[in-house]
Structures are given as structure tokens and as C-alpha cells.
Amino acid sequence: MEVDTTTLIPIKFEKIMQSRTYTCIVLASEEKKFGVYTNLESGKSIQAHLTKVAPARPSTHQFIDHIFQGLEVSVKQIVINELQDTIYFARIFLEQKRGDLLHIVEIDARPSDSITLALTHKAPIFCMPQVHTNAIAMEDTAL
């Protein structure tokens, strides 16, 4: 199943902010910026991708990416689809072409993992309108 992107809000990855205990993934639409908070490992994985620093051994995200490459699967898009008590939820859409057949699979995933894979695959990030409305805006001074 594919989500109708005409009702979705396009989101751009802005940056990550890391502390000693958590990572904030800053996302932005045309109207506002908001943060998705996650663990340090997710932040390190995004940072490694952005700086193109390869770790000695593959990270979990790199491992997943190797599986995708082997199965000829690509990340089509991600959708941040729900917000409950400051916890975001996401769906990742995977695409596999086999000859004339096209398979699209929708999977529940953590936003941090979804965003990391979207950045790796240069896939678009979207947000459901109600999630965007309820996301707490970050002030530019806090960034």
C-alpha cells in the first residue's frame, strides 16, 4: 500500500544535536522545525553517514542496507505517521523491482531508523498533517 503524498507534508532533515545522553534529530517543514529524540547510537549512525566515516565493523543500519542491496530493495519513502505523548511513529516504504513486477512493502519502524535509511537512500521524508500540527516547534534560538 502506498500513501497518497498529496496529503502529506514534505519534511527535510536539518541536522542532529547530540548530548551525552540522547540525540535530537531536527526536522523542518516550510512552517516549522521540530525534534525527534532518540538514543546516542542512532545519532552516531547518522553522523557517520553525514561525515562519510566508515566504522571498523558495519553498524546495524549499514547491515540492513547491505541486505537491501543484496535483495535489490530500495527505500521509496518514509512517513512519520503518528505522535503519542511526545513519541513519534513512522512507516518505511520499501520497493523491490523484479522484471516487470514491482513490490512495495510498508513496515512499521522507529523514526530514527527510518530517517537514517532515508538519508542513506536519498528517499523523501513526509509527515502526516495531524502529526505536523501537534509537533512542538523548536525555536531557532534553541538550535
Give the residues covered by each predicted segment.
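Divalent-cation
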Residues: M1-L143
